[in-house]
Amino acid sequence: MGYPLHQLSLGNRLDTIHTDIRQLAARLGQVSRGESLIREMQQRLHTGEDKNPQPPGALFLQPRGYTSGTDTLQDEALRLAGWHNLAAQHGVKGYTPVPLEEILRWQPGTLFTSSFSESGDSLAERQLRHPALKRLLAKRPMVEIPFKYWICPGPMLADAVALLRQAREGVDQ
């Protein structure tokens, strides 16, 4: 069809997101807008930055027991927000299902989830309401971070980090 094509890397790290923004901005002839977007993102990411040497443990948990280990946007966001990703600590790489027994053994201080749609009653979603998980959650929150922040890497990572930091404030008090 003759249209120029530019493929983004869809990385899962902040530096890769910055590279994608710069490359796309250059392709569009909007270098200064790209740099401005990166500066704004950096400013938001460093606002409220936590220097706690002992970040609390947290875990992303999705239907069917999927969690986010290393090399994921969620792992990067947790780190930037001052959390310790228990899945990464236990060797989980990428998006991987983890047995409920492991999650219970890890004892996450906070659980995060993201809904793809309105809550349903699928077997996959029922796992998030398992009685053993409910007992764990009786003392810990499960915090919903909207899925729109994870659909693809970009400036919205700063919004996700802000929500994770907000949840962190409740834990630190």
What feature does the model see in each segment?
Residues 1-66, 87-89, 94, 106, ...:
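Extracytoplasmic substrate-binding proteins
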Residues 50-51, 75, 133-135:
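Short secondary-structure boundary/capping segments
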Residues 97-102:
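Short acidic active-site motifs
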